[in-house]
Each structure stands twice: as C-alpha cells, then as structure tokens.
C-alpha cells in the first residue's frame, strides 16, 4: 500500500543495504513503472523484489491473475533482482503454480486462527498451512528440472518390464 510513498522508499534506499520487497497489489502499470524507475535512478533496482499481487481478503481464484508473474518477468526481469508472488487466496495450491511460473519468493500472511476478526485473517495461513506450503514448495523446487540423462536410473527396471520392444526373451 506504500509503494508510491517515495519519501519512505528513498529512506529505505539510503539507509537499508538489503533487498527491498515491494508488493504491486492495488497498483496500476504506470505506478509500477514509476517504482522501478525510482529504484533505477537511485542505483538500487538490482536489490528490488517485485511481487505480483491482487489485494483482497480473500481473493477469488479468478482474480489471482497468476500470469502477472510472467508479465512482470518480461517487463522487469532484466532490471530488478527478481519477481515474487504475494497471495491472499484460500489454500496453498496457487502458490505451487506461482512457483512453477517463476516466482522466486512466495509471501503469505500468517495467523494462529483464521476466524479471528481483522481484514486478512480469513486469507492467512495457520501453522499447519505454512508447514504444508513449505513442504509443497520444496517438492516443486526439487521437481523443476530437466532429465540429466535420457533414462533415469529409476526408469531402467521399469523399461525392461513395461516398454514394448525392450524385453529380452529367454
């Protein structure tokens, strides 16, 4: 909500040496371009992490708009440090898809009880949800690879049993 508060962003640029993470929820494309230009002028664009985000609590799946991750990567991927995803949806399935689309960071709200009063508790994850999200994110990260060889070791015994034309007759 403060990504247009340029005095605050200037203070961060001048006084904080780490990565600066900015959500683009509730932000127009001209406003997001202004944020990136601001960080470029200050020599800090390479420390900027932009988050694709739809701000709502909770956000319907139809409004998550995951392909914004790809759009941001095309528009700013060579300028900023990386692109992330900030989710305010129910569940954790969307986060795995965001990771598959190239989101380097996943940001979710955390609560001890989703029934508590407040704007974002309903869209937040409870402790078990966070554990499942981390488990799934790890599985997705490990599986996003190419085969290092034509046949993996796990496939060789299956191939000799199941693939037509590869059985050795006695």
Where are these regions (language model features)?
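Catalytic cores and adjacent flexible loops of soluble metabolic enzymes
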Residues: 1-170
């Amino acid at each position: 909500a403060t990504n247009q508060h340029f005095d605050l962003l200037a203070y961060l640029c001048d006084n904080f040496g780490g990565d600066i993470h900015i959500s683009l929820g509730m932000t127009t494309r001209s406003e997001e371009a202004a944020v990136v230009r601001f960080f470029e002028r200050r020599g800090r664009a390479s420390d900027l992490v932009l988050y694709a985000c739809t701000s709502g609590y909770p956000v319907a799946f139809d409004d998550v708009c995951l392909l914004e991750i790809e759009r941001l990567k095309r528009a700013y991927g060579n300028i900023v440090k990386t692109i992330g995803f900030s989710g305010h949806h129910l569940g954790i399935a969307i986060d795995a898809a965001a990771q598959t689309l190239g989101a380097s960071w996943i940001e979710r709200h955390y609560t001890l009880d989703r029934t508590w009063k407040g704007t974002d508790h309903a869209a937040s994850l409870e402790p078990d949800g966070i554990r499942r999200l981390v488990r799934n994110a790890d599985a997705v990260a490990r599986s996003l690879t190419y085969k290092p060889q034509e046949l993996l070791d796990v496939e060789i015994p299956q191939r000799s049993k199941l693939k037509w034309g590869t059985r050795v007759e006695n």
